[in-house]
C-alpha cells in the first residue's frame, strides 16, 4: 500500500552492524544475498507503476494521542507539560527520568506545580535480560514504581495505544508511591522482577494493569505522570 525505500543491502548492513549476519538462519542469509545480487526483486519503490493511483493519508499519529491527553488534563484543570512524542531508548531509563521529574515536582514544585500532568509519547525498548513476561510499557511502570516509592499523590502510567504491550493481553500498567509497599505485603520483589523482565505477573497480582482490549489503532505508546 506504500512504497518501501529500504533495500536488501540495508537489511544486511543492520545485521553486520550488530554482528549477527552469520548468526541468522541460513535461509534468511540466502534470501538477503540473493536480493543483493539482484536475483530477487526489491520491494516496490516510489515511482513504481502500481502506486500511480494510490494516495496514502496519515489520519492519526502519536501527536494526536498526546494532544487528546493534554485536552483531557486541561479539562480537569491540570497544568500540562509534553516532554516529547518521539521517546526512544530503554524503558527503564525513561522511568528513571519520570521518577526524577516526580521528585522535583514533589520537592520543589517544578517544572510544574501540582496539580499537573507530564506526558510523553513514543516507543522505548527493552533489552531482554531475563526469562520473565511483560512489555515495554509494563517494564517502564515497574521501574517507575521503584523510582517514586513513598511519594504521596503521584501516579505514573505507561500503555500501548493498540491495547497490547509485548506478548501480553494488557495495554500497560499504572503505579503510585505506595505500589512498592503493596508489593512487599504481597511478597513480591519488584527489583528482582525488573531484573528478570517479569513485570506482568507482578501487576496482575497487584491488579495494576491497564486493560483496554484491541483498540483498532496503533500510534506507539503514552507515558504519563500525574501529581495532585
Residue ranges with predicted function:
Residues 142-228:
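Internal helix-turn-beta structural module
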Residues 91-100, 126-140, 166-174:
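Short glycine/threonine-rich loop-to-helix capping motif typified by GTGT followed
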Residues 2-97:
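Accessory alpha-helical/coil subdomains and C-terminal extensions
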Residues 60, 74-77, 85-89, 109, ...:
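A cross-family phosphate/adenosyl-ligand binding-site feature
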Residues 2-18, 130-156:
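Gly/Ser/Thr-rich active-site loops/lids in small-molecule metabolic enzymes
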Residues 78-125:
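Long, well-ordered mid-to-C-terminal structural blocks that present hydrophobic/aromatic surfaces
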Residues 1, 119-122, 157-161:
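Short beta-strand segments
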